[in-house]
């Protein structure tokens, strides 16, 4: 690629210290290989093993750090301080996007439909949660991605164990109303929605969990997604509003449900989605003609905005 030199020296930020380190290493290696194939002068940079001050030796950064430390505004803040352009969402949008409760609060304040929820503390009366949300519910750590620490609870007696599992990953835990229906994911490139993908985990999987996302090969990905053209455009428009409401930029992903009455519900936003062979953004981009290598270069192109 003749114009790859315009990027200068690129740090591909991968690994890190979060619960999603293994996924980030896989994603980061895939991105690194793609950039190198495209002629970009790119190098792997793992903040767990190197001081972030060494980033001053690079012209820009491609962030493929998933979870805390990489997706929550921390590394974005460091890069802002060092005046190094980087891919994706900025400090504030990243911090909001990593916090499932803050995300929901912003969506609710913007009149965007998101599943009802309750924050769970040691003092919370679980019977009142069940009375409010019904069963089943899904228990989630508020600040984790990749479905880490999540459980579906169908019986009241399983509530405590699910909360215990979630608190191993985060001090803040939430219960969210379970929405029965079809799950969709909407990817973004250059701030615009790509074709919707329908997710169909196998029957023995309660939801699109960590194993389904990264380890199983029997998850079905529907492109086209099975929605009518009108419905797909409606969902894309809804998710674009949701993406912009939290301050997300560039590339990312929003997960949503359609209930049995046909209503759409926003679940969460992902500001640094996976880029592995199982990942959803590459699948959506492929549907509109992007190879994986072209996708990675297009994401990196965002770092040139305002510098030309």
From Swiss-Prot:
ATP binds at residues 130-185. Keywords: ATP-binding, Cell shape, Cell wall biogenesis/degradation, Cytoplasm, Ligase, Magnesium, Manganese, Metal-binding, Nucleotide-binding, Peptidoglycan synthesis. Its EC number is 6.3.2.4. Mg(2+) 1 binds at residues 255, 268. Coiled coil: none annotated. HAMAP family: Dala_Dala_lig. It comes from the Bacteria. Residues 104-301 form the ATP-grasp domain. The gene is ddl. This is D-alanine--D-alanine ligase. InterPro entries: ATP-grasp, D-Ala_lig_Van_CS, D_ala_D_ala, Dala_Dala_lig_C, Dala_Dala_lig_N, PreATP-grasp_dom_sf. The keyword Nucleotide-binding applies. GO terms for molecular function: ATP binding; D-alanine-D-alanine ligase activity; metal ion binding. GO terms for cellular component: cytosol. Its cofactor is Mg(2+); Mn(2+). It is found in: Cytoplasm. It catalyses: 2 D-alanine + ATP = D-alanyl-D-alanine + ADP + phosphate + H(+). SUPFAM superfamilies: Glutathione synthetase ATP-binding domain-like, PreATP-grasp domain. One of its GO terms (biological process) is cell wall organization. Mg(2+) 2 binds at residues 268, 270. Pathway: Cell wall biogenesis; peptidoglycan biosynthesis. It holds the Pfam family Dala_Dala_lig_C. Signal peptide: none annotated. Belongs to the D-alanine--D-alanine ligase family. Cell wall formation. The keyword Transcription does not apply.
